[in-house]
Regions:
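Short amphipathic alpha-helices and their capping/turn segments at secondary-structure boundaries
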Residues: 29-35, 187-189
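Conserved phosphate/oxyanion-binding catalytic-loop motifs
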Residues: 175
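Walker A (P-loop) phosphate-binding motif
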Residues: 1
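Acidic, Mg2+-coordinating active-site environments of NTP-dependent enzymes
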Residues: 14-25, 29-31, 39-172
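AMP-binding/adenylate-forming catalytic core of the ANL superfamily
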Residues: 178-192
Length: 192
């Protein structure tokens, strides 16, 4: 949505005493300055892979658009939540240091998720869940309560979805991966 619509939605939520909102900051929206006047407590950087090149034309332009949130929009002492195992982590670390942002790494929470072992979970789902948990904690939710509620979470259809399991333990999964990186992550999860 355009900037005016975003602010109308946020104002409506505020009037209805909704104090924490999660917004997907698309590279298009960042590039078009649609999110510049929003006060974010934190931002999550999940990954970076070949996508949206019809708009951005090249990977450098695409990455620069995604980094606008971290380089220009987040205010001092805001948080960046990410995975130290992604290629862009050193860039995020440098931005955090230069801008006085706090970088939250997800290794410990990933271990806790794996111990709780939720159904068939791919590595990318575990990482995304870990980042969401860290964001929820920043909104004041207690970790213990978050982990209790995980049993109620329904998977997104078509994302490493177990479609069928045969008696000989062969499993069929559906995933709508549409980028080379997403397909690779699905295949790596199946390998495990």
């Amino acid at each position: 949505p355009d900037t005016i619509s975003i602010h109308k939605y946020l104002q409506f939520l505020k009037k209805n005493e909704i104090n924490n909102v999660i917004i997907e900051a698309s590279s298009h929206g960042l590039d078009q300055d649609r999110l510049h006047h929003i006060n974010f407590k934190a931002a999550i950087f999940t990954n970076f892979s070949q996508d949206h090149l019809d708009y951005h034309k090249n990977m450098t332009s695409y990455l620069n658009a995604k980094l606008i949130l971290f380089k220009k929009i987040l205010k001092k002492n805001s948080r960046i939540i990410s995975d130290k195992n992604i290629n862009e982590y050193p860039v995020l670390k440098k931005i955090a240091k230069n801008r006085g942002l706090n970088l939250i790494e997800i290794v410990k929470i990933i271990k806790k998720i794996k111990i709780t072992s939720l159904n068939e979970m791919s590595e990318f789902k575990i990482k995304n869940l870990a980042m969401a948990i860290e964001a929820a904690k920043l909104c004041g939710l207690k970790e213990k309560k978050i982990f209790k509620s995980l049993k109620k979470i329904k998977d997104v259809d078509g994302r490493f979805e177990l479609a069928r399991q045969f008696s000989n333990n062969i499993k069929v999964f559906i995933d709508y991966a549409h980028t080379p990186d997403a397909l690779l992550k699905v295949l790596q999860s199946l390998e495990r």
